[in-house]
Curated annotation (Swiss-Prot):
Regulation of this protein's activity per its record: Inhibited by phosphoglycolohydroxamate (PGH).
Result, substituting residue 73 to S: Loss of aldolase activity
Record annotation: effect of changing residue 209 to F: Slowly inactivated and unable to discriminate between the enantiomers. Shows an inversion of the diastereoselectivity. Loss of aldolase activity
Keyword presence, Zinc: yes
Record's protein name: L-fuculose phosphate aldolase
Superkingdom, natural source: Bacteria
Misc remark: During catalysis the binding of dihydroxyacetone phosphate (DHAP) frees Glu-73 residue from its interaction with zinc ion. Then Glu-73 residue abstracts a proton from the C3 atom of dihydroxyacetone phosphate (DHAP) (or from the O4 atom of L-fuculose 1-phosphate (Fuc1P) in the backward reaction), and moves to transfer its proton to the aldehyde oxygen atom (or to the C3 atom of dihydroxyacetone phosphate (DHAP)).
Site (Plays a key role in the stabilization of the transition state and positioning the aldehyde component): 113, 131, 209
Organism: Escherichia coli (strain K12)
Active site feature: 73 (proton donor/acceptor)
Amino acids binding Zn(2+): 73, 92, 94, 155
Assembly description: Homotetramer.
Catalytic activity, reaction form: L-fuculose 1-phosphate = (S)-lactaldehyde + dihydroxyacetone phosphate
GO cellular component, one term: cytosol
Amino acid sequence: MERNKLARQIIDTCLEMTRLGLNQGTAGNVSVRYQDGMLITPTGIPYEKLTESHIVFIDGNGKHEEGKLPSSEWRFHMAAYQSRPDANAVVHNHAVHCTAVSILNRSIPAIHYMIAAAGGNSIPCAPYATFGTRELSEHVALALKNRKATLLQHHGLIACEVNLEKALWLAHEVEVLAQLYLTTLAITDPVPVLSDEEIAVVLEKFKTYGLRIEE
């Protein structure tokens, strides 16, 4: 797909992320795999002011094009693509319920079968590290080895998928799961969860289920 079209999709995803209540201000960032690297949102520009020319290309060596500053979180986007060869899009946000669970430093357990949308029986919480650091990117790479989404302790959420539409869909699903988890935690702790055997059944069914979008 041509660069300008991908850039437009990135901007549309950012705007939709805000519309869904998953993000606010200039927080969060979005990228797509492109050539030997990625296209990513810039730093410090509100989503509603973004144009295609603001979107930044970073090559596979981490070098960005001159005259543009990428999101400070570009390292963990790169780490996500390296950890997940099947991923072509990454969405990061500070969704309220996901961030609240991350502050508790808890993984989201199998409270609902939709947990399997992220690839397993839980959604992990990667350890805290300062934003934009190599240390944080290493935590993200490890957390995403066997999952399509992870919480970031005291920070937010990152979700990756085969395209932007599915990455945003997954991010929204995880936020709903986080809200359900916090609601249930207010009643009982530990919370009731589905068995590993049931999640294995759901994972198998999910091979032919989910958001259907033409690639």
